[in-house]
């Protein structure tokens, strides 16, 4: 795996881990304190049910081929919907919980499954385990430093936190887009 590919595969997720750890305390406290128990429970149920359906569909070769063919569309739809849902949710709390439940279960889930599948296509066995551990360590490092800074940035405006999460997701979408090309079409591809 080339260093450029490693950079694309690591930089977006590490940035997302860092930004979400930095901003999530403010966002979660704000929204959880304003949502009803019924909406919260419905969002959990919706997310679980949809994720089960989506993950079941990945096992069907014909459907998985369709997902791979439409990877870019899945990422773009996920990014657009995440930003729309995130900003609408400041006025409509229910939109956040139900919208993100659907996104996390469907498009975000597919995005992650497809990226893992692409990496699994070029790395196998012990090398795959080492890569996944390396990737996890970097993501946890980003999360750790984001959480450490969150202790000091407790007064960030909600809109700034939401904006930072949207920007981090867009950057991750861009790096995954480039990594996808390298994994399936570039010199790192192993078909």
Model-predicted segments: where are they?
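Helix-to-loop junctions at the C-terminal end of transmembrane segments
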Residues: 54-68, 154
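Helix-loop boundary and gating motifs at the non-cytosolic
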Residues: 2-52
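Hydrophobic core of transmembrane alpha-helices in multi-pass small-molecule transporters
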Residues: 14, 93-111
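Glycine/proline-centered helix-kink
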Residues: 24-25, 140-151
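C-terminal ends and interior cores of transmembrane alpha-helices
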Residues: 76-92
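Loop-to-transmembrane helix entry/capping segments in MFS-fold secondary transporters
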Residues: 37-38, 123-135
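Symmetry-related core transmembrane helices of the 12-TM Major Facilitator Superfamily/SLC fold
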Residues: 159-178
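Intracellular juxtamembrane helix-capping segments at the cytosolic ends
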Residues: 27, 109-123
């Amino acid at each position: 795996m080339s260093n450029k590919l490693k950079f694309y595969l690591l930089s977006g997720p590490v940035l997302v881990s860092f930004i979400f750890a930095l901003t999530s305390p403010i966002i979660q406290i704000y929204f959880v304190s304003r949502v009803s128990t019924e909406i919260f429970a419905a969002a959990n149920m919706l997310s679980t049910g949809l994720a089960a359906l989506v993950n079941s569909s990945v096992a069907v070769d014909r459907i998985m081929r369709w997902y791979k063919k439409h990877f870019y569309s899945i990422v773009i739809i996920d990014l657009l919907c995440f930003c729309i849902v995130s900003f609408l949710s400041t006025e409509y709390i229910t939109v956040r919980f139900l919208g993100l439940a659907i996104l996390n279960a469907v498009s975000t889930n597919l995005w992650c499954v497809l990226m893992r599948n692409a990496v699994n296509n070029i790395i196998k066995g012990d090398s795959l385990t080492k890569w996944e551990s390396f990737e996890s360590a970097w993501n946890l490092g980003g999360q750790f430093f984001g959480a450490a800074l969150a202790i000091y940035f407790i007064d960030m405006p909600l809109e700034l936190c939401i904006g930072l999460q949207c920007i981090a997701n867009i950057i991750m979408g861009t790096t995954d887009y480039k990594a996808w090309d390298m994994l399936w079409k570039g010199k790192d591809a192993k078909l």
